[in-house]
Amino acid sequence: MVAIKRLATVDADFKAQMDALLAFEAAQDEGIERTVIGILADVKARGDAAVVEYSNKFDRLTASSMADLELSKAEMQKALDGLPADQRQALEAAAHRVRVYHEKQRMEGWSYTEADGTMLGQMITPLDRVGLYVPGGKAAYPSSVLMNAIPAKVAGVKELIMVVPTPGGEHNQLVLAAACLAGVDRVFTIGGAQAVGALAYGTEAVPQVDKIVGPGNAYVACAKRRVFGIVGIDMIAGPSEILVVADGSSDPDWVAMDLFSQAEHDELAQSILICTDAAYIDRVQASIEKLLPTMPRREVIETSLTNRGALILVRDLEEACAIANRVAPEHLELSLADPDPWVAKIHHAGAIFIGHYTSESLGDYCAGPNHVLPTSGSARFSSPLGVYDFQKRTSLIKVSKAGAQTLGKIASTLAHGEGLPAHAKSAEFRLEN
């Protein structure tokens, strides 16, 4: 029997139990940190030569130059053309839905003119160049290519450079096909901290980017943290999370499988059920026991559920929503008979999946909204990846001669108050009297 925690809000120590359940902090491995610092410094100093050397070492390659580590657009197109029909159709359908959704996020500029002729506004411009990191090998995720690349292209990013390691020289054709569909401009078959360094600093072959997005292992995450400030980054993602709020009206097998869908990612993933019905919680646990033996990744799922999962009994749905807001999960399912009135009660979640038929996996692949979501409670202050992450806002100020008289006096007074006389004079020189 899976030893998943059973909690109840009526328990005297419920708060302490919740604190323990949610206590997760990504470990900082000093060995990884030292390795990454060394690799980044080497790439910054030696450029292509360092990238080739590390790629050969870590990915078991025999590249002699960066020319051996760049794929052409023809190779991306070949990967797309070579897909089985069902895979190509699914990839194209997902790409279309992701593009349609994200086109609605595009920010537009605005301005207004005051009575004295002064114009104020905001201009929206895309980033010039973005780097997309994609994990390599057999476990590569083409859906991540679509979710990261399409919003960038919708935003108007001029050049999108993808880096993807190819251990043993193995190319994932689905990933390359997704890159082709999403409009990726260049692909380098490099990975790890050396790829992050190449994107952040630029080398002879790899242009420096303005922002790096995409998931990666501990070395990649560490490297992204280290180069932040030189370039922008999307986020440092923690383990996957799902929280299901249920009232007992949905098939318990569905809920159990939804919990599995995140637990199968890795042992640190977190799957939580919050329910108003104790008997239904029992049925979900029975479904877990029944379905787990059928899962190829059952050991990972069981470890995840045992270490970080929970089945929580609450008094009512108001209490369920309050707990959900405290958790601020990456994925939140409202598995309720009448879910719509409860959506407004949720203030903190990466994405909300509403109703019995909205499985979290649809959001992962093809519903349309982005699957790059805030984790580890950061949905309290963060948002999903979107077009706005690839656009910048620039303030516009055009002061008329009349406006300079009014604003100049205000600015002069405030500047003198702050002890900045040159600021004051800059405004005063434009005053008529």
UniProtKB/Swiss-Prot annotation:
Pathway: Amino-acid biosynthesis; L-histidine biosynthesis; L-histidine from 5-phospho-alpha-D-ribose 1-diphosphate: step 9/9. Keywords: Amino-acid biosynthesis, Histidine biosynthesis, Metal-binding, NAD, Oxidoreductase, Zinc. It comes from the Bacteria. It catalyses: L-histidinol + 2 NAD(+) + H2O = L-histidine + 2 NADH + 3 H(+). Its cofactor is Zn(2+). Binds 1 zinc ion per subunit. Gene3D superfamilies: 1.20.5.1300, Nitrogenase molybdenum iron protein domain (3.40.50.1980). The active site is at 330 (proton acceptor), 331 (proton acceptor). GO terms for biological process: L-histidine biosynthetic process. GO terms for molecular function: histidinol dehydrogenase activity; NAD binding; zinc ion binding. Substrate binds at residues 240, 262, 265, 331, 364, 418, 423. Zn(2+) binds at residues 262, 265, 364, 423. NAD(+) binds at residues 133, 194, 217. Disulfide bonds: none annotated. GO terms for cellular component: cytosol. Its EC number is 1.1.1.23. The keyword Amino-acid biosynthesis applies. Belongs to the histidinol dehydrogenase family. Catalyzes the sequential NAD-dependent oxidations of L-histidinol to L-histidinaldehyde and then to L-histidine. PANTHER family: HISTIDINE BIOSYNTHESIS TRIFUNCTIONAL PROTEIN, HISTIDINOL DEHYDROGENASE HDH. This is Histidinol dehydrogenase.
